[in-house]
């Protein structure tokens, strides 16, 4: 049955699915594709026993198109906010920051500590094969996967092999040229 609104028509079957604390958009997409396929099989195998049910309209939100500027990481935000943002932006558009006038795409990171930082937000505090620790206004973001412009996605250990003097460098929201 067709309906005039966007995703507002009656449904034959509905399922819930948990979202883990470290789930990326890419992972959620794949999990929901599997769940959706199973739901289709369930409905089609016993179609007559399913009755269309009107969807609730309360609490429904519309996800607008992600704009390019939304990918820019604002280091004055808490580390936990940035880590969630990066998970939501994987596989598109990724997070963007600038290091020494070079655009970097950040793919994955974890938030550590929830304390206010004395370092300037965006300052690289520590580098190891486990990740690149960056000061945020609140907490530290450990970057674990990133990409140089025109390059391929690398884990932190691979990335730091091509960069000297990262500790103390400041990541920016814009190109500093």
Feature map (PLM): residue ranges:
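Donor/substrate-binding cores of folate-linked one-carbon enzymes
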Residues: 1-63, 67-69
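A generic secondary-structure signal marking the coil-to-beta-strand transition
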Residues: 9-10, 62, 71, 102, ...
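Active-site-lining helix/loop region of Rossmann-like oxidoreductase modules
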Residues: 42-98, 105
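An anion-binding loop in the catalytic cleft
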Residues: 76-177
């Amino acid at each position: 049955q067709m309906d005039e609104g966007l995703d507002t028509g009656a449904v034959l079957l509905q399922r819930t699915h948990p979202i883990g604390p470290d789930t990326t958009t890419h992972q959620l997409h794949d999990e929901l594709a599997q769940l959706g396929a199973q739901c289709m099989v369930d409905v089609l195998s016993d179609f007559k026993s399913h009755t269309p049910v009107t969807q609730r309209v309360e609490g429904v939100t519309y996800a607008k198109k992600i704009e390019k500027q939304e990918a820019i990481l604002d280091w004055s935000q808490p580390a936990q906010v940035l880590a969630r943002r990066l998970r939501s932006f994987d596989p598109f558009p990724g997070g963007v920051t600038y290091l020494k006038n070079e655009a970097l795409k950040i793919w994955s990171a974890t938030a550590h500590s929830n304390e206010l930082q004395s370092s300037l937000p965006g300052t690289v505090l520590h580098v190891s094969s486990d990740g690149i620790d960056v000061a945020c206004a609140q907490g530290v973001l450990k970057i674990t996967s990133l990409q140089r412009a025109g390059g391929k996605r690398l884990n932190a250990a691979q990335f730091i092999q091509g960069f000297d003097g990262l500790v103390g460098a400041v990541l920016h929201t814009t190109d500093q040229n």
